[in-house]
Amino acid sequence: MAEHPLTKFIPNLITLMSLIAGISSIKFSIQANWKLAVLMIMLAAFFDFFDGWMARKLKKSSQFGAELDSLSDFISFGLAPSLLINLCFTHELGRIGWVISLFYIVCAALRLARFNIENMKEQSKVFYGIPSPAAAGVIMIPLYLNFIDQVQFTINYPLICAVLTTFAGIMMISRVPTPSVKNLKVKTLYFRLMIISVAILLIFLISYFWQTTLLVAIAYLLISLLSLLTYFFTFFRRVS
């Protein structure tokens, strides 16, 4: 059966949907519609996961697609979340808050540039540093908490955001090995358990969306911290 000529455009179309979601997040951030801004970044992450998966399934990977994906990631997970956090919280820190936002954006750009030139085939189960969608999820932790509590922004939020944004920026450009599930191969038994776990997660997301999102983000943050501590422990043990 002949392949439809439009099939090759499907992965890039999904990437463009991620880009549109990221730009929409910027619009909602400017309008101070924080929940929609966060949801647009989450939607961008959803599309970002599936564009690569679809490209591999259809065997339609291309240099053009890779460059478009990086541009989309920079806007959706570099520029959009940094602007969101600055407009919502860290603007209260004045110039320092703006510098931290710029630092995160620059780190996202550097990570994506490095990702493009490195041979990622050697990293089937490990990322070096944290990917930009995960970094965006981490720096939005205070927003998830605020949505749950339904409280007014407190003086602690800007400081927490500044620390998380700086940490996420550093981790994006670091050489710290962190787990990756994109290309993880699992045995049949573990695959079934993974499917059950995902189903349970979806149930909790439907019932307790922001609470579940917060727990997942905190869990990833703790894993990243553990990876960083393990990296330093291994490094100092080698040099001592």
Model feature map: region roles:
Residues 20-24, 79-80, 195-203:
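Hydrophobic, membrane-inserted alpha-helices
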Residues 23-26, 43, 47, 81, ...:
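Alpha-helical transmembrane segments of polytopic integral membrane proteins
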Residues 46-56, 106-118, 159-177:
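Hydrophobic, membrane-facing alpha-helical anchors
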Residues 1-49, 227-228:
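Topogenic membrane-insertion module of multi-pass membrane proteins
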Residues 24-40, 79-99, 141-160, 206-211:
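Helix-coil boundary and interhelical linker segments in multi-pass alpha-helical membrane proteins
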Residues 124-240:
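C-terminal membrane-associated helical module and adjoining short loops/tails
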Residues 1-19, 54-74, 113-134, 177-191, ...:
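Interhelical loop and helix-boundary elements at the membrane-water interface
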Residues 9-16, 57-112, 142:
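Multi-pass membrane catalytic core of lipid/isoprenoid biosynthesis enzymes
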